[in-house]
């Protein structure tokens, strides 16, 4: 006997819909998928597990969709909510694809696409599911027969992402005490975390876990003297070292220092010089360590060289798109410094010597003294990731 069918017009196109469709099938006018197929939880210096990734969300319905809540759940226990984003926490994580206008409402027009920056924490001892799912609560185009321009309340769970279990353990990229992690993980509004670039035909978040390392001097200051002199900064000229055994796969060492105090003219910045003088180190297993903004002619390695952990690669400088001397460091899954996916990692051994105030940093940037953020007794840490504005002794 032939299956009975009827013709329905949906989203401007006529679809043949079976009366006896499988019960588990569901029309989902708003679709979503992770930007990368997997993520990894790492323990930060706050003692919590951090998970950081992105979702690509597209509205396929003719009605404007409104995102109300996104919940993260485990595939093995979907009733237990691991993270919940709504209100300001939801809106602040929504981005347009590319360098579009700031998102002011949690809505997606017909055929529109948004990026959603996921970051949440779990207690250190909480078991992280092998697969995460995302439960969407939203208003969107309804099923066949619904008014064309009327949004209907809906809830469904989509967008699986795998969670790896092998943590990448690195050595420190620098030596000494008082190194401060600027622009670090994991707030969506952060300079590194919020930067997704369309490179080589795809959107990449190469700087998901990037850190800008600056050094406090004995007076808990980042610089002393003329702000426009690179030599006034405590970190300038510091030795940059290999975080693991590896092979040098790319270098640049010909660029001059920028004048500190402000970013260079954007017209002078290109994909080739944005990161200044740099080293890319292949540490195996499709993982690459990236060091940026090094001094001109300071590199002690060349492409093809094999290096050992702790070996000096070059000297910290102020080249490329930078307003003050610092070391930009991140780990990635390819040799392209912008067209790769940023990877999480932990550093095997260090001390936490303080936590600087984000309010003070916003008010004064790197000026003034920072002694109030230093601890009287640093604490030893093993296999943790330094979080934003933490002060680290290597």
Walk through the language-model features, giving the residues of each.
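Short, solvent-exposed loop/turn segments enriched in Ser/Thr/Gly
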Residues: 35-37, 47-54
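Short glycine/threonine/proline-enriched tight-turn/helix- or strand-capping micro-motif at secondary-structure
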Residues: 40, 50, 192-242, 251-272
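Short histidine-centered loop motifs in beta-beta connectors
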Residues: 241, 283, 287-310
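Acidic, glycine-rich catalytic/binding loops that coordinate metals and/or anionic ligands
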Residues: 164-182, 190-194, 224, 241, ...
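Zn2+-dependent peptidoglycan hydrolase active-site motif and core
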Residues: 247-295
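A structural signal for short beta-strand/turn segments enriched in small hydrophobics and glycine
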Residues: 246-248, 304-316
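Asparagine-centered strand-capping/turn motif at beta-strand->loop junctions
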Residues: 57-64, 74
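Intrinsically disordered, low-complexity Pro/Gly/Ser/Thr-rich segments with frequent PxxP/GP/PP motifs
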Residues: 80-127
């Amino acid at each position: 006997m032939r299956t009975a069918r009827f013709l329905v017009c949906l989203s401007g196109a006529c679809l043949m819909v079976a009366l006896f469709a499988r019960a588990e099938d569901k029309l989902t006018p708003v679709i979503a998928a992770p930007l990368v197929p997997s993520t990894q939880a790492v323990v930060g210096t706050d003692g919590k597990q951090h998970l950081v990734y992105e979702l690509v969300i597209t509205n396929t319905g003719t009605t404007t969709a409104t995102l109300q809540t996104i919940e993260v759940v485990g595939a093995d226990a979907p009733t237990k909510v691991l993270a919940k984003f709504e209100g300001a926490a939801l809106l602040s994580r929504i981005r347009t694809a590319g360098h579009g206008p700031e998102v002011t409402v949690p809505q997606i027009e017909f055929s529109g696409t948004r990026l959603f920056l996921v970051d949440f924490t779990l207690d250190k001892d909480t078991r992280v599911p092998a697969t995460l799912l995302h439960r969407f609560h939203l208003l969107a185009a309804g099923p066949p027969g619904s008014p064309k321009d009327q949004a209907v309340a809906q809830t469904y769970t989509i967008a699986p992402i795998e969670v790896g279990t092998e943590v990448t353990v690195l050595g420190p990229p620098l030596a000494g005490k008082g190194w401060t992690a600027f622009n670090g993980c994991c707030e969506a509004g952060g300079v590194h975390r919020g930067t997704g670039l369309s490179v080589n035909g795809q959107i990449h978040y190469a700087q998901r876990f990037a850190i800008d390392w600056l050094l406090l001097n004995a007076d808990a200051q980042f610089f002393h003297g003329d702000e426009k002199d690179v030599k006034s900064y405590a970190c300038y000229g510091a030795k940059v070292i290999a975080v693991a055994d590896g092979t040098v796969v790319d270098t640049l060492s010909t660029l001059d220092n920028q004048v500190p105090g402000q970013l260079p003219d954007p017209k002078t910045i290109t994909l080739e010089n944005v990161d200044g003088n740099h080293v890319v180190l292949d540490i195996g297993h499709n993982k690459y360590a990236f060091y940026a903004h090094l001094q001109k002619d300071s590199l002690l390695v060349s492409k093809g060289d094999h290096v050992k952990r702790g070996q000096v690669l070059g000297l910290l400088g102020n080249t490329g798109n930078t307003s003050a001397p610092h070391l930009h460091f991140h780990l990635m899954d390819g040799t392209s410094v912008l067209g790769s996916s940023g990877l999480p990692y932990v550093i095997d051994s260090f001390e936490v010597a303080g936590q600087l105030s984000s309010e003070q940093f916003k008010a004064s940037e790197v000026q003034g003294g920072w002694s109030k953020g230093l601890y009287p007794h640093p604490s030893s840490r093993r296999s943790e990731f330094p979080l934003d504005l933490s002060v680290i002794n290597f």
